[in-house]
Amino acid sequence: MNAFATAFQVYVAALVFARVGAMVMTMPGIGDQAIPARIRLSFALLMALILAPLVQNTVGPIPSTLGGLGGAVIHEVLIGLMIGSVLRLFMTSLTTAGEIISMQTTLSFAQSTNPSMEGSSTAVATFLSMLGLTLVMATDLHHLFIAAIVKSYTIFPFTRAVPVNDAAALAVQTVAQSFSLGVQLAAPVIVFSLVFNLATGLVGRIMPAFQIFFVASPLSVILGLSLLALSLSGIAMVWTDRYRELLDIFT
């Protein structure tokens, strides 16, 4: 019995680690490539060791075949990837807002490395992405990440099949909402750009000899960034509230 109990405990811990590890590797913040792999692995292992005794009563017997064992592990990995990917997809709303703001203020050429996107983006998009990660930590949203990991075993127990259709629908909905939110967050700068371009067009039409381009470009950058600075508090509050609503689905 002792040998069976030990084998069963290892089996449960492996399943929990498969789900938690997949979630941690795809979640915002802790799952970024900028975080050393050892830290991410250690965090996932610690969470697995904590959760394994709590959920072992809901786990079925150890499969008698290698295929059954592999299927159980893949099942857990897919659920972890589903939850973590949805949480990361919503982070693109800030990147979208930053890209739109950069286009409206003629700053699209200013590229920088964006750790959260694992690639390059405009400087404004990178700044807003870093702002999002800061807000996650400052407003304790990362606690809801941990709550989502724990609650996932109630929403998606070991015996339930992977909800592929629901996961695909949620991913599409999250992408649509993140893009819509990105446009909304950039709305003040979009309105400013429309008014500013209309005004400069009228000035250029009235005074053709006036070199409007040399005045409009720096003025667009200064006024656009000033408006962004004034809008940051509103952007932070709206984005945090919307992200909290998304996390409520899993908590």
Curated annotation (Swiss-Prot):
Belongs to the FliR/MopE/SpaR family. Its main location: membrane. GO terms for biological process: bacterial-type flagellum assembly; protein targeting. This is Flagellar biosynthetic protein FliR. It is a multi-pass membrane protein. NCBIfam families: fliR. Signal peptide: none annotated. Disulfide bonds: none annotated. Role in flagellar biosynthesis. One of its GO terms (cellular component) is plasma membrane. InterPro entries: FliR (IPR006303), T3SS_IM_R (IPR002010). Keywords: Bacterial flagellum, Cell membrane, Membrane, Transmembrane, Transmembrane helix. It comes from the Bacteria. The chain crosses the membrane at residues 10-30, 43-63, 67-87, 130-150, 183-203, 212-232. The keyword Transmembrane applies. It comes from Caulobacter vibrioides (strain ATCC 19089 / CIP 103742 / CB 15) (Caulobacter crescentus). It is found in: Cell membrane; Bacterial flagellum basal body.
